Design a protein with these regions (language model features):
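N-terminal intrinsically disordered/low-complexity leader segments
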Residues: 1-36, 228-232
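Alpha-helical DNA-contacting segments of helix-turn-helix folds
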Residues: 49, 84-91, 135, 151
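Amphipathic alpha-helical packing segments from all-alpha helical-bundle domains
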Residues: 100, 143-169, 180-184, 211-227
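Helix-turn-helix
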Residues: 40, 44, 51-82, 86
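Amphipathic C-terminal alpha-helical segment
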Residues: 165, 186-205, 223-232
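Short hydrophobic clusters on alpha-helical segments that form packing/core surfaces
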Residues: 41-49, 91, 95, 121
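Amphipathic alpha-helical segments used for helix-helix packing
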Residues: 126-143, 195-203
């Protein structure tokens, strides 16, 4: 083999080696902007949760769906619980927005607004059962996480605000203990119905057209909160 042939052969091997390195390099460095990867990981985490459940959820499974190294989700979220925490926080953001969507279509009357929030609550659970269970029935998310804590508190404060608008006389504000009884009762009504539907109960509500279903949910919520006294 001549020297020139040897140099050409080594050059060819170098090209092949560099190609292999590029092919095996984590895809996140080539296919994703930092923010896009974060969102893609959350989207894939949601799909992983839906298909495999909490017990089968793993960072490796999420990474495989996005075609990145398993270190990528660990870099962004730390561990599986960190990723589930971020997923729960995003769930609460969508949960708040879904209730807002229903309130926009409802009359401005405080009781109608509270009822619409309840419908949004239940419909969100029906549309996102895996996320709903993660938000309310799992110990995996870290509720000491500042972002999750903030959005969860915002959701609760929205409930308090709408119950207060129905029941409180501004000239004689209720004591916190009395107000919280009203809030707890309204919350139990919406959450109880949502939980029953997510668990597969009340099949007649699950099998009808969404618009009819939503009207019936509104009727149930309306009846459940009818005990709340109107403001004087």
């Amino acid at each position: 083999m001549t020297l020139s042939t040897l140099i050409l052969t080594l050059s060819a091997f170098r090209v092949i080696f560099q190609t292999m390195k590029t092919t095996n390099h984590p895809a996140e460095e080539h296919s994703y902007h930092h923010g896009n990867l974060f969102s893609a990981l959350l989207d894939s985490a949601e799909q992983e949760l839906i298909e495999r459940g909490i017990e089968g959820f793993s960072l490796r499974g999420v990474a495989k769906r996005v075609n990145v190294s398993h270190a990528a989700p660990a870099h962004h979220f730390g561990d599986a619980n960190g990723l589930l925490t971020a997923l729960a926080a995003r769930g609460f953001e969508r949960f708040i927005q879904r209730q807002r969507d229903f309130r926009r279509r409802a009359p401005a009357d405080p009781r109608a607004q509270l009822e619409a929030s309840g419908v949004g609550y239940v419909v969100f659970a029906l549309e996102n059962p895996a996320i709903f269970r993660l938000m309310f029935s799992s110990d995996r998310p870290d509720f000491n996480d500042s972002n999750l804590q903030q959005v969860a508190e915002s959701a609760f404060e929205g409930l308090v605000k709408h119950v207060r608008a129905v029941t409180e006389d501004k000239s004689s504000p209720k004591q916190d203990s009395a107000m919280m009884l009203d809030v707890a009762a309204a919350w139990a009504a919406a959450h109880g119905l949502a939980d029953l539907l997510v668990a597969g109960r009340l099949d007649e509500l699950r099998s009808i057209a969404p618009r009819t279903r939503d009207r019936r949910i509104a009727a149930i919520i309306g009846r459940a909160i009818s005990f709340l006294p109107n403001r004087r």
